[in-house]
Structure formats: C-alpha cells, structure tokens
C-alpha cells in the first residue's frame, strides 16, 4: 500500500466514524480519490506528494472529460476535503487543492491529545457522577486502552465484557478478528458502568444485546452521539472541542504507544491495520508531536531570536 493510498484510507475512515457518512457517500469518495490518484500517477505523483500545479491540472481535466457538472463538482469536493483533512492532521504543510501554503509559523499541529488531556477528559466525564458520566468514562477508557474504532466500540456485545476479561475479541474491517487488551483502568470503568447500564435500556425492554444500548431508533449509541458527548466533556475539561473525537482518542492510543517505544508492527496488530503503511502515518505524527513539545516546553525552545 502506497502512502497516498494509506492517507486516502485514513480520510475515508474519518468520514465514516466522525461524520457518519453514508455508505454510498464513502463509496463515491473512494472512487473519486482513486480517479485523482490515477491522473496524478501519470506525472509520477500520488495524493501525498502532489503539488498545486498538478492538482489544478486534474481539476481542469475533469472539466474536459465531458463529465456531468455534478460528478466533476463532487470529485473536486472530495479532493479538497481530503487535503483539508491531511492539513489538519499535520501530514502536509500546504493545501495543494487551493494553491495556498500554510505559513510555517502557523502550521497546524497533529491532532494528538496529551496524556494529561486524556486524564482531564476522564475527570470531566466522571465529574458528572451519573450514569451518563460513567458511560462516557467507560467509552474513553476502552478506546484509549485498546485503540478501538468507534464502530468497533459500539458494536461490542454485552457478553464480550460480562466476565471482566483481560482481552476483547474485536471484529474489525472486513470481518477480521483481533485481540484487544484491556488495562486495569478500563476494566474498572467497565465494572462501574455496568452497574448503571440498565438506565440506558430501551423502554419496555429488560435487556439489550449491546454493551452500549440506547433508547434511540437503532437500539444502541451512534457515533454522532458519542462525538457530541466527547465535545461536551472537552469543553468542561478546558480542551478545544475540535481536538477531541473518537478518532483522535484512537490516534492518542497509537501515538503514545509509539512514543513509549512500542514496535510499529505491534501497533499495526493492535489497530487492526491490514498494511503497515497505514500505521507508519503515526511515526510522522509522533515526530511532529515530540518536536512541538520540545519547542514549546523546553526553556531554550521557547527563546526568541
């Protein structure tokens, strides 16, 4: 898998879990990015290293192909949204789809939560001292302890955690199963939540097969609702709410492991990545994160001039 393909996969995953994009939308965007990659490959480029001139040439090519205006507009939109995502993740310093380079001084930082921010987020969730607070704390602990995708978290059956296991069996992309470890903090959070879980059961039901049931139409929590709850907790914790999402918690799991010296292949297995190229994204994110810490926290790094 090339770097461009890995970035495209990460973008589509974000669209699925954070924006709850419909399957048809994800399929269309996947084809749009594949179309762009096909054009870029003719000049020896891919999505990760394309320059503004090449992207502009691609946009002009869309207009010359005789595509319907709606299709051409959607493909431009897909590419622009992709590069906004890449810029926001800190994987590039510019947005070639808009011919505007971000100045070095204002380079966006990778969306990585510090360890103390994770603790503040958990404290804000637990401070509610309610069933909702315990549920949110449980979800945060599970994602941060095991690197679960939000779709994997919300698909967990109650039986998966009913007996206080040290590991979860997670069914990921393509139906592939993997083992996800649980630390003591996550197991304690699950125990505390299970006591309050009946408060979330649909009316008229004595139980639900899901670990995180809901009274909504689906019978279980949705990714969008989890995102809203995390944003509320971020505000309460004094953290930029745009910096917090289920996907970013998964990022934090991987980045903090890498910074702690974990092998990249181990992280690949824990995240359920089919290709190591997808996991290698985190080596860049971790490097940027550590450089920022040195620049802002080290006494010499803060000196000007």
Swiss-Prot record:
Q: Subunit structure of this entry? A: Forms a cyclic heterotetrameric complex composed of two molecules of XerC and two molecules of XerD.
Q: Which CDD domains match?
A: INT_XerDC_C
| One Pfam family matching this protein | Phage_integrase
Active-site residue numbers: 149, 173, 247, 250, 273, 282 (o-(3'-phospho-dna)-tyrosine intermediate)
Keywords per UniProt = Cell cycle, Cell division, Chromosome partition, Cytoplasm, DNA integration, DNA recombination, DNA-binding
User: Which terms does the record give in the GO molecular function aspect?
Assistant: DNA binding; tyrosine-based site-specific recombinase activity
PROSITE patterns named in the record = CB, TYR_RECOMBINASE
Where can this protein be found? Cytoplasm
Superkingdom of this protein's organism: Bacteria
Q: What is this protein called?
A: Tyrosine recombinase XerD
Q: Is Cell division set as a keyword in this record?
A: yes
Gene encoding the protein: xerD
Q: Name one GO cellular component term.
A: cytoplasm
One GO process term, biological-process aspect: chromosome segregation
Function, as annotated, reads:
Site-specific tyrosine recombinase, which acts by catalyzing the cutting and rejoining of the recombining DNA molecules. The XerC-XerD complex is essential to convert dimers of the bacterial chromosome into monomers to permit their segregation at cell division. It also contributes to the segregational stability of plasmids.
Q: Which InterPro entries has this protein been placed in?
A: CB (IPR044068), DNA_brk_join_enz (IPR011010), Integrase-like_cat_sf (IPR013762), Integrase_catalytic (IPR002104), Integrase_recombinase_N (IPR010998), Integrase_SAM-like_N (IPR004107), Recomb_XerD (IPR011932), Tyrosine_recombinase_XerC/XerD (IPR023009)
Residue span, Core-binding (CB) domain: 2-87
**Residue ranges annotated for the Tyr recombinase domain, each copy included:** 108-295
Q: Family assignment? A: Belongs to the 'phage' integrase family. XerD subfamily.
Do you know which Gene3D superfamilies this protein is assigned to?
A: 1.10.150.130, Intergrase catalytic core
């Amino acid at each position: 898998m090339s770097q461009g393909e890995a970035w495209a996969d990460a973008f589509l995953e974000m669209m699925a879990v954070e924006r709850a994009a419909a399957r048809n939308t994800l399929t269309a965007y996947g084809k749009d990015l594949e179309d762009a990659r096909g054009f870029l490959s003719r000049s020896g480029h891919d999505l990760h290293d394309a320059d503004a001139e090449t992207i502009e040439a691609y946009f002009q090519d869309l207009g010359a192909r005789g595509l319907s205006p709606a299709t051409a507009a959607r493909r431009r939109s897909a590419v622009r949204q992709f590069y906004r995502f890449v810029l926001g993740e800190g994987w590039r310093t510019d947005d070639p789809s808009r011919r505007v380079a971000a100045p070095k001084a204002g380079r966006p930082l990778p969306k990585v939560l510090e360890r103390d921010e994770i603790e503040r987020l958990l404290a804000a969730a637990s401070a509610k001292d309610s069933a909702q607070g315990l549920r949110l704390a449980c979800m945060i602990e599970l994602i941060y302890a095991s690197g679960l995708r939000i779709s994997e978290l919300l698909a967990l059956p109650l039986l998966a955690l009913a007996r206080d296991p040290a590991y979860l069996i997670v069914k990921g992309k393509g139906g592939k199963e993997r083992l996800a470890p649980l630390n003591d903090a996550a197991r304690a959070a699950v125990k505390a939540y299970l006591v309050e879980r009946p408060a979330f059961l649909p009316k008229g039901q004595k139980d639900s097969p899901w670990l995180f049931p809901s009274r909504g139409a689906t019978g279980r929590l949705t990714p969008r609702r989890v995102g809203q709850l995390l944003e509320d907790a971020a505000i309460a914790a004094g953290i930029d709410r745009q910096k917090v999402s289920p996907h970013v918690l998964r990022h934090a799991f991987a980045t903090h492991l890498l910074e702690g010296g974990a092998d990249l292949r181990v992280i690949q297995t824990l995240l359920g990545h089919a290709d190591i190229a997808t996991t290698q994204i985190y080596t860049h994110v971790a490097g940027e994160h550590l450089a920022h810490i040195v620049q802002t926290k080290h006494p010499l790094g803060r000196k000007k001039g």
